[in-house]
């Protein structure tokens, strides 16, 4: 949720952010109007309450007919107070509903436009060439080495489901373990998170549970399957006051993730690039507003460290405003080269959500003024970033393949596979 005080004082900044996202600017003026109505209703209520208190004292001192007359006025005034209270509550509700429709304020420097308007920050490594043989795609390789079974996945669960078996299962577990160990070495607390969450937790992270077609819902229990452990990790400290005296609070969550892929009909139908269920290690950070940008760069560096360990050529892109999720003020994606597609495909993303999620989830820290004196509380900043996920297998199999379909294991991964140097053809 955005800061209504900031919006009221700097409406042009929020209009510009909405324009950059391709979103409706008029909501900014609607919120300002709703805030004015809320303030007016609250003032009316408080004035009537004060008047009610005065009448209460008069009634206590009055006698006889005067007291009866005053009691009649008090009753009428009580009805007015009740109506004013309802009006103030309604104005507050309307304002909150409008605020929940506004995505996070975009950071300065984020590219304007949509999905194709990203800016390439840097490119690392060179896409592999195959002068001696025609490269196979990840599914063909996966079938040759007994790693991926899409046919039985579809038989058991439907389209976009799969089995990882044998070296495929081992490879995913190795990736996730390497990612988790790296996170722990960087000071993250490892977490195994719930994959079902309450609607208030899902909404708190910025998802629209009523209109988001990507989310699986268990209607009888009113619970939602998460598409990332970010959701559970964001809700972990809901309604709490955090202490950053020892620095940022960093968690690394491992979980299964679920996405309906409702808008992906016909896209990436072959293999495991776009699936309904996958596993992931997600980094999540709580920190101060002042430290958020620096933490964002650290998250990106940790993601790049994993890509380097996997010996994959990749690029980093600064995602355009119109392609940002509601919660993100800025997002960087790391995309690895997929040889048979002749394209870079996203393997990781990292987002700075500033105070957006924390305001929705009521996560705060104790504030101090310039003299170090306590001054109430304020919203914290939250950030997230992917460290490893099932999709990495796509790039690993294709980039490190041999002519016969076997796959060389990157050196850093070998110890997590019992020293295995090559994934052999069966």
Swiss-Prot record:
Q: Where is the composition biased (Basic and acidic residues)?
A: 1-15
Q: Where does ATP bind?
A: 259-261, 275, 346-349
Chain positions recorded as L-serine binding sites? 228-230, 282, 386
Q: Which reaction does it catalyse?
A: tRNA(Ser) + L-serine + ATP = L-seryl-tRNA(Ser) + AMP + diphosphate + H(+); tRNA(Sec) + L-serine + ATP = L-seryl-tRNA(Sec) + AMP + diphosphate + H(+)
- Location(s), subcellular: Cytoplasm
Q: Where is this region: Disordered?
A: 1-22
Q: Which GO terms describe its molecular function?
A: ATP binding; serine-tRNA ligase activity
Name the InterPro entries on file: aa-tRNA-synt_IIb, aa-tRNA-synth_II, aa-tRNA-synth_II/BPL/LPL, Ser-tRNA-ligase_type_1, Ser-tRNA-synth_1_N, SerRS_1_N_sf, SerRS_core, tRNA-bd_arm
Q: According to the UniProt record, what class of enzyme is this? A: ligase
As recorded in UniProt, its EC number(s) are 6.1.1.11
Pathway terms, separated by semicolons: Aminoacyl-tRNA biosynthesis; selenocysteinyl-tRNA(Sec) biosynthesis; L-seryl-tRNA(Sec) from L-serine and tRNA(Sec): step 1/1
- Entry keywords, A to Z: Aminoacyl-tRNA synthetase, ATP-binding, Cytoplasm, Ligase, Nucleotide-binding, Protein biosynthesis
Q: Name one GO biological process term.
A: seryl-tRNA aminoacylation
What cellular-component terms does GO give this entry?
Answer: cytoplasm
The keyword Nucleotide-binding belongs to this UniProt entry's keyword annotation? yes
Pfam families, alphabetically?
A: Seryl_tRNA_N, tRNA-synt_2b
Signal peptide positions on this chain: none
Family under the similarity heading: Belongs to the class-II aminoacyl-tRNA synthetase family. Type-1 seryl-tRNA synthetase subfamily.
Written domain comment of the UniProt record: Consists of two distinct domains, a catalytic core and a N-terminal extension that is involved in tRNA binding.
**Function as written in the Swiss-Prot or TrEMBL entry:** Catalyzes the attachment of serine to tRNA(Ser). Is also able to aminoacylate tRNA(Sec) with serine, to form the misacylated tRNA L-seryl-tRNA(Sec), which will be further converted into selenocysteinyl-tRNA(Sec).
Q: How does it assemble?
A: Homodimer. The tRNA molecule binds across the dimer.
What this protein is called in its record is Serine--tRNA ligase
């Amino acid at each position: 949720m955005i800061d209504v005080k900031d919006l009221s004082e700097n409406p042009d900044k929020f209009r510009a952010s909405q324009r950059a996202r391709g979103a409706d600017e008029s909501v900014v003026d609607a919120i300002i109007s709703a805030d004015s109505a809320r303030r007016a209703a609250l003032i009316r209520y408080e004035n009537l309450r004060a008047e009610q208190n005065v009448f209460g004292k008069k009634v206590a001192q009055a006698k006889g007919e005067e007291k009866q007359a005053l009691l009649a006025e008090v009753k009428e005034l009580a009805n007015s107070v009740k109506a004013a209270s309802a009006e103030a509550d309604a104005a507050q509700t309307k304002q909150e509903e409008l605020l929940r429709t506004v995505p996070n304020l975009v950071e300065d420097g984020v590219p304007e436009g949509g999905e194709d308007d990203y800016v390439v920050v840097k490119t690392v490594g060179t896409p592999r060439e195959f002068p001696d043989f025609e490269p196979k795609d990840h599914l063909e390789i996966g079938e040759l080495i007994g790693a991926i079974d899409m046919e039985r996945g579809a038989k058991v669960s439907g389209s976009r489901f799969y089995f990882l078996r044998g070296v495929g299962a081992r490879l995913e577990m190795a990736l996730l373990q390497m990612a988790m160990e790296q996170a722990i070495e960087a000071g993250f607390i490892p977490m195994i998170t719930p994959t079902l969450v309450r609607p208030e937790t899902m909404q708190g992270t910025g998802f629209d549970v009523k209109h988001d077609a990507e989310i699986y819902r268990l209607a009888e229990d009113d619970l939602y399957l998460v598409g990332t452990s970010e959701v559970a990790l964001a809700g972990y400290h809901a309604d709490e006051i955090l202490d950053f005296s020892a620095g940022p609070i960093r968690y690394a969550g491992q979980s299964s993730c679920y996405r309906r892929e409702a808008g992906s009909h016909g896209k990436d139908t072959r293999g495991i690039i776009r699936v309904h269920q996958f596993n992931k290690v997600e980094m999540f950070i709580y920190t101060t507003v002042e430290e958020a940008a620096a933490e964002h760069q650290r998250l990106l560096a940790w993601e790049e460290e994993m890509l380097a360990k996997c010996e994959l050529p990749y690029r980093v892109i600064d995602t355009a405003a119109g392609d940002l999720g509601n919660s993100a003020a800025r997002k960087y994606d790391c995309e690895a080269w997929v040889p048979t597609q002749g394209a870079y495909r996203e393997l990781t993303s990292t987002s700075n959500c500033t105070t957006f999620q924390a305001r929705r989830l009521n996560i705060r820290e104790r504030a101090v003024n310039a003299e170090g004196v306590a001054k109430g509380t304020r919203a914290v900043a939250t950030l997230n970033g992917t460290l490893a996920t099932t999709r990495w297998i796509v790039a690993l199999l294709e980039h490190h393949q041999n002519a016969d379909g076997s796959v060389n294991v990157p050196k850093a991964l070998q110890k997590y596979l019992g020293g295995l140097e090559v994934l052999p053809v069966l």
